[in-house]
Design a protein with these regions (language model features):
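Short, solvent-exposed loop/turn motifs
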Residues: 9, 37-39
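An extended, acidic
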Residues: 39-94
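Short hydrophobic/aromatic-rich beta-strand segments that constitute the beta-sheet cores
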Residues: 31-34, 53
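DPxDG-like acidic metal-binding loop motif
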Residues: 1-32
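A broad, low-specificity signal marking well-ordered, structured residues that form hydrophobic/aromatic
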Residues: 23, 36, 49
Length: 94
């Protein structure tokens, strides 16, 4: 759930029922997971990074599904995660 004020994303919350975690963020207040402050990872090298992605529900809908790029990057990173939820993928960037 999010709130935009004058076209600017200002407040947001994401709940992960599987892990019972609540992510919240607001402009000027930072972000939290279960009230603990979180921040974006400081990892700078691709080989130490976790690749998070998703694919279209119906792979036959489009021929440009970035599969070749995904395969290439898979071998350059620490690992791959496909959660099925874009909002959770973004929350776990921190």
């Amino acid at each position: 759930v999010g709130l935009m004020i004058d076209g600017v994303p200002s407040v947001g919350a994401i709940y992960d029922p599987a892990r019972q975690e609540l992510f919240r963020a607001a402009i000027g207040l930072g972000a939290t997971c279960d009230r603990r402050p979180i921040r974006v990872s400081q990892t700078t090298e691709l080989r130490n990074s976790l690749l998070v992605t998703g694919f279209a529900y119906d792979r036959h809908q489009t021929t440009d599904h970035n599969y070749a790029e995904f395969c290439y990057l898979t071998h350059l990173t620490q690992g791959v995660r496909r959660s099925g939820s874009a909002s959770m993928d973004l929350a776990y960037v921190a």
